[in-house]
């Protein structure tokens, strides 16, 4: 029975990680900013969701359909996800300035790029920073600043996210904390660059 409970724990942890993947949180963030506050007007919301949500998700499809990548497991899955994510973040920042969009939109997109570069830099030095925690924390912090402080309650969602990551052995507590604070630092930096 203990083994069965363990299997249920693993299944629950995997489900939590799937439901809270960063691209889903990014899409929710953009939609809330669009429909509650009117940011990302017109087609900007669609394009930004494509850059921040759809493009990063494509990495998992590429990993799945290319046997050589799939055979190597998470050794290739994580770097591929980071690469596709950073590409999407670069495109979103470029779009913000070409369009051009306002300060809040620039803060949002530049924070994603900042966070992606920090995660990539950490990986280059063999330091793991939880992209999952980062992808949860960033939207919560941004929405609490620019929509309503009630969104700070969203940080309670990090409890099951932390549990699932620890249960599956994906991250250590320090890696999860590093991932959580990275986008907050990014938002603060971007707010100095793009005053609201």
For each of these PLM feature ranges, what is it?
Residues 1-14:
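Short, Lys/Arg-rich, polar N-terminal cytosolic tail immediately upstream
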Residues 16-36:
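The first (N-terminal) embedded transmembrane alpha-helix
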Residues 12-20, 73-81, 100-107, 121-129, ...:
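Short, amphipathic, aromatic/basic-enriched membrane-interface segments that mark the entry/exit
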Residues 34-98:
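Selected alpha-helical membrane-embedding segments in polytopic membrane proteins
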Residues 25-27, 83-95, 113-115, 133-137, ...:
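Core segments of transmembrane alpha-helices
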Residues 30-37, 60-67, 96-97, 119-123, ...:
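Membrane-water interface at transmembrane helix exits
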Residues 13-14, 18, 44-52, 77-82, ...:
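Alpha-helical transmembrane segments of multi-pass membrane proteins, especially transporters
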Residues 105-196:
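Membrane-embedded catalytic cores of phosphoryl/pyrophosphoryl-handling enzymes
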């Amino acid at each position: 029975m203990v083994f069965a409970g363990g299997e249920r724990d693993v299944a629950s942890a995997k489900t939590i990680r799937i439901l809270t993947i960063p691209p889903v949180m990014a899409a929710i963030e953009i939609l809330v900013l669009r429909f509650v506050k009117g940011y990302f007007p017109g087609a900007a919301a669609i394009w930004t969701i494509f850059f921040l949500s759809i493009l990063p998700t494509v990495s998992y499809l590429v990993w799945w359909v290319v046997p050589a990548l799939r055979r190597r497991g998470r050794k290739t899955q994580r770097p591929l996800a980071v690469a596709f994510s950073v590409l999407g973040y670069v495109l979103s920042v470029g779009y913000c300035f070409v369009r051009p969009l306002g300060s809040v939109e620039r803060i949002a997109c530049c924070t994603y790029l900042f966070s992606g570069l920090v995660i990539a830099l950490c990986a280059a030095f063999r330091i793991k920073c939880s992209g999952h925690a980062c992808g949860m924390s960033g939207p919560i912090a941004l929405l609490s600043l620019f929509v309503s402080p009630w969104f700070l309650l969203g940080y309670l969602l990090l409890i099951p996210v932390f549990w699932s990551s620890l249960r599956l052995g994906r991250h250590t507590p320090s890696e999860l904390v590093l991932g959580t604070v990275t986008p907050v630092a990014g938002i603060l930096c971007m707010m100095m660059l793009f005053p609201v």
